[in-house]
Amino acid sequence: MSMVKEFKEFALKGNVMDLAVGVIIGGAFSTIVNSIVKDLIMPVVGLATGGLDFSNKFIRLGAIPPSFKGSPESYKDLQTAGVAVFGYGSFITVLINFLILAFIIFLMVKFINNLRKPAEAAPAEPPPTPEDVLLLREIRDSLKNSPR
């Protein structure tokens, strides 16, 4: 079998195509979640914490070079200048992104699993008692009631 034919067979399998579609949709979905966190959740968190902007929270670890022209209070300016900074604010934002994404995926999987479950039918009525059992019960009852 030629290598091209093997690759074509591999690439056109359902699992590979499903994975490709999942990656593309996941990338688009990640953009949506990032926007939700950045534009909707973090402003509310900032408002609740008195205007705290997490994206600019950091601890400077290295010295500022003499040629530095930016603001020493700006995380991005310090990073651009090559100063070592511990950007815990960015980490908090990424962590919130991850938690929201994980929760939404959990809800989606739960929803899909519920769709896959067969509808739980109401308990079926017991089958009618067979005639031979009814006859045996009659015989038993008549023997109980007959004098000995």
Swiss-Prot record:
Listed HAMAP family: MscL
Lineage, uppermost ranks: Bacteria, Pseudomonadati, Pseudomonadota, Betaproteobacteria, Burkholderiales
Family note: Belongs to the MscL family.
Main location: membrane
Quaternary data: Homopentamer.
GO molecular function terms noted in the UniProt entry: mechanosensitive monoatomic ion channel activity
Protein's name in the database: Large-conductance mechanosensitive channel
UniProt topology in membrane: Multi-pass membrane protein
InterPro entries in the record: Mechanosensitive_channel_CS (IPR019823), MS_channel (IPR001185), MSC/AndL (IPR037673), MscL_channel (IPR036019)
Family matches, as PROSITE patterns: MSCL (PS01327)
Transmembrane segments: 16-36, 89-109
Assigned GO CC terms: plasma membrane
Function: Channel that opens in response to stretch forces in the membrane lipid bilayer. May participate in the regulation of osmotic pressure changes within the cell.
Keywords recorded for this protein, A-Z: Cell inner membrane, Cell membrane, Ion channel, Ion transport, Membrane, Transmembrane, Transmembrane helix, Transport
Subcellular location: Cell inner membrane
Domain of life of the native organism: Bacteria
